[in-house]
């Protein structure tokens, strides 16, 4: 009888492997490997492209960018493969103006530079097409994973990058961008940034022009990214969006009270919205009181807190690799993802929950955003034409009599 009990106990410590032998419940490395074989690990935010811009001026054909062997930062092909990555949202980041107090309508080159970043993203993926696959929809992302490639998607990190223009946003979408973070570390014509509140200024949330942006992003099927925005902006957007939102690289405010993180009331609303919060690894965000002591378990704590408050359907991963110099011990570069999943399983997550975390959740959100967009478009909703009233620009701040009848040519074109 004792022998039978021991045998039964041994059986309970095993979990089935699809089409293979059983694996001990406590063999977290093998269980993590199984998770990453069955679901694509999709990271919500990586700034490698900005590092390329700063180091090579977006020149990738001269042999000076050894992406296929080893780069100095956090990301290259060998480490992505070691990290079992199945998909990456590449940020086409361009920094805010150097003066955060500069008027929003000050002329700048951010939109031009953003298009150049989209261009280098597409060229990089094409150059390494044996390993990477450019995708602009979730079906393609799944196909890339089945074919053993790393799905590569594009996200814009801040409304300043499209000049606070809905028409410019639309063209960025047509060029391939599939999410836009509403702000970076500067306010724009649509919303207040978290950095503004950190600087001691009031949290004004969305502007009167903000709803027009959300309406158009919903219509296009463009993911609304609420990382970097103020807490009130988060709440304002969640009240009006018709589609799920993402936080491409944010963590839990209750665990670490940094304004870049998401408070519990917003986490609960994200669950109702069916969105996803993709946990970032930046040490000063995940452990604001002692960043140097942050480690992989610190990040696991954020993952579990979001899962407890919002549910396992609403948590994902967005490391912010190559966008920070502060990373927890054990998560030094993109190769460390399997170790993180080991720790998540060791902390008590099921493999089903881990699959949701690594990629199934963000793919579900992306799919729903597309479905809602198709429904909106079928209903006959036209592109938003509204422009920001505070902008500078030829013929937009003045009204001519052209549409009312013959008028003198007020603006020369020759």
Curated annotation (Swiss-Prot):
Disulfide bonds join 96-186. SUPFAM superfamilies: Metallo-dependent hydrolases. GO terms for biological process: proteolysis. InterPro entries: Metal_Hydrolase, Pept_M19. Substrate binds at residues 184, 260, 320. One of its GO terms (molecular function) is metallodipeptidase activity. Its EC number is 3.4.13.19. It catalyses: an L-aminoacyl-L-amino acid + H2O = 2 an L-alpha-amino acid. The keyword Glycoprotein applies. Belongs to the metallo-dependent hydrolases superfamily. Peptidase M19 family. This is Putative dipeptidase TRV_05564. It comes from Trichophyton verrucosum (strain HKI 0517).
């Amino acid at each position: 009888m004792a022998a039978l009990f021991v045998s039964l106990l041994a059986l309970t410590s095993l979990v089935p492997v699809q089409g293979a032998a059983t694996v001990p419940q406590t063999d977290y490395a093998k269980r993590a490997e199984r998770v990453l074989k069955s679901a694509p690990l999709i990271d919500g935010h990586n700034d490698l492209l900005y590092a390329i811009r700063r180091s090579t001026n977006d020149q990738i054909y001269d042999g000076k960018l050894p992406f296929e062997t080893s780069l100095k930062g956090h990301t290259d092909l060998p480490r992505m493969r070691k990290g079992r990555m199945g998909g990456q949202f590449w940020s086409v980041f361009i920094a805010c103006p150097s003066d955060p107090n500069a008027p929003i309508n000050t002329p700048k080159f951010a939109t031009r530079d953003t298009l150049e970043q989209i261009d280098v993203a597409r060229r990089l993926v094409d150059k390494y097409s044996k390993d990477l696959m450019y995708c602009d929809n979730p079906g393609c992302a799944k196909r890339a994973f089945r074919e053993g490639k790393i799905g590569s998607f594009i996200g814009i990190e801040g409304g300043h990058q499209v000049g606070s223009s809905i028409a410019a946003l639309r063209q960025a979408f047509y060029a391939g961008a599939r999410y836009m973070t509403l702000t970076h570390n500067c306010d724009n014509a649509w919303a207040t940034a978290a950095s503004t509140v950190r600087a001691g200024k009031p949290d004004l949330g969305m502007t009167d022009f903000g709803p027009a942006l959300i309406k158009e992003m919903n219509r296009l099927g463009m993911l609304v990214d609420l990382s970097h925005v103020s807490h009130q902006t988060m709440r304002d957007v969640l009240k009006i969006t018709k589609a799920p939102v993402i936080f491409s690289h944010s963590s839990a405010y209750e665990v670490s009270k940094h304004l870049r993180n998401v408070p519990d009331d917003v986490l609960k609303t994200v669950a109702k919205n069916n969105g996803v919060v993709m946990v970032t690894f930046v040490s000063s965000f995940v452990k604001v009181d002692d960043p140097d002591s942050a480690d992989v378990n610190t990040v696991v704590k954020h993952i579990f807190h979001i899962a407890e408050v919002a549910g396992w359907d609403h948590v994902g991963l967005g490391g912010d690799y190559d966008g920070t110099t502060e990373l927890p011990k054990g998560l030094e570069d993109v190769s460390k993802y399997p170790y993180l999943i080991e720790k998540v399983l060791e902390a008590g997550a099921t493999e089903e929950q881990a699959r949701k975390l690594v990629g199934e959740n963000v793919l579900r959100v992306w799919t729903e955003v597309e479905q809602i967009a198709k429904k909106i478009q079928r209903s006959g909703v036209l592109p938003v034409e509204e422009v920001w009233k505070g902008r500078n620009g030829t013929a937009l701040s003045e009204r001519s009599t052209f549409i009312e009848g013959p008028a003198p040519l007020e603006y020369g074109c020759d």
